[in-house]
């Protein structure tokens, strides 16, 4: 059985020529049968790619030939199914969109905490633990005792941080803060923001939830549930074993068994989370895309229009 290697990586580094990097990088990926998304901006690179191991490693080697990316770190995972069906290299203002000018993780960032030391940190009652991910991600799993900002995008986090009572007690004393996200990139910016706002004791989970699940055995873990990932696996658990969630191809939210059993679920068209907010014309269009995808699947072809990729990947490697 063919297996696909997924590699996730990011690096904050000055890339003033980022637009010129796009075409040769796309050519390299296509030549090596690698699919996924690479985001490029003046502040760095952020990506999740997948394909045959030799192809993925060839792309990583190509990137590391640039002296600015020579120390690029990546995470690996295996999948029996193709996580992505297209290769996209996109030029962006930010490699993870927060929308706050002047925040540079290369200048100031929170203190990295290794997975082995994370339990002790978040077990401290004086530490405010914040899950920086979107609400649909938090909904299927998080750390015990973590605060959920209940946001729909990472760009909403700065406003929440400015108003969160736990961060602005009546005493005026700024608390210790521990932040986490899927792979680490969102915390690079969120901890940098808090440091810029005068919070001195700010920490974040090195390597994110994925590194924690890979490193910490279940019997020692404070993680509850599954971790949402932005590829065909949808969710993973301890040991990065693929979880039991499916993905609504209409709204791109994770679905559990109860969602799939709901009369509001129609494959590729709607689910209990989006049925009421989509119009009939949207459902009709989705129904036709699903039909085309099923025809292509029956012919053992790839139908790009109904591929399993998320429409947007707000934080590819940093999820």
UniProtKB/Swiss-Prot annotation:
Domain Rhodanese: residue ranges? 123-221
Which residues are catalytic? 181 (cysteine persulfide intermediate)
Q: Which residues cross the membrane?
A: none
**Class of enzymatic activity (EC top level):** oxidoreductase
Reactions that this protein is recorded to catalyse: uridine(34) in tRNA + AH2 + O2 = 5-hydroxyuridine(34) in tRNA + A + H2O
Its EC number is: 1.14.-.-
Among the GO molecular function terms of this UniProt record, one is:
oxidoreductase activity, acting on paired donors, with incorporation or reduction of molecular oxygen
Biological processes per GO annotation: tRNA modification
Spans annotated as Disordered: 298-319
Question: What is the top-level taxon of the source organism?
Answer: Bacteria
Which keywords accompany this UniProt record? Oxidoreductase, tRNA processing
InterPro entries attached to this UniProt entry: Rhodanese-like_dom, Rhodanese-like_dom_sf, TrhO, TRHO_N
Name the Pfam families for this protein.
Rhodanese, UPF0176_N
Family of this protein = Belongs to the TrhO family.
Q: Which NCBIfam families match?
A: PRK00142.1-4 (NF001136)
Q: What does this protein do?
A: Catalyzes oxygen-dependent 5-hydroxyuridine (ho5U) modification at position 34 in tRNAs.
Protein known as: tRNA uridine(34) hydroxylase
Phylogenetic lineage = Bacteria, Pseudomonadati, Pseudomonadota, Betaproteobacteria, Burkholderiales
Q: Encoded by which gene?
A: trhO
